[in-house]
Amino acid sequence: MKTLTASLIKEEDMWVAKCPEVGTVSQGASVEEAVANLREATELYLEEFPRKINIRSIFTTFDVENVKA
């Protein structure tokens, strides 16, 4: 078992979840549903395309100018 990262973004009425280590993406109506769907998608992907996963993710923030909210 590996612990992977889920990055979530709210888009309109859905949550979009991404796994940066594998590249899988899924969505759900709630954070919990999006993560559960991402887990399933990632497991299915890795069953079809097995590979060694190096977990070396680094997340940071950055500022941008002239963004209209």
Name every feature range the model reports, one short phrase each:
Residues 20-23, 44:
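Flexible, active-site-adjacent loop/turn segments at secondary-structure boundaries
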Residues 13, 23, 65-67:
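Intrinsically disordered, low-complexity regions of eukaryotic proteins
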Residues 1-4, 36-69:
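Short, charged, surface-exposed hinge/linker loops at domain edges
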Residues 22-31:
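A short, exposed loop/beta-hairpin motif centered on an aromatic-Gly-Thr core
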Residues 5-21:
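Short aromatic-glycine-(Arg/Gly/Cys) micro-motifs in beta-strand/loop hairpins
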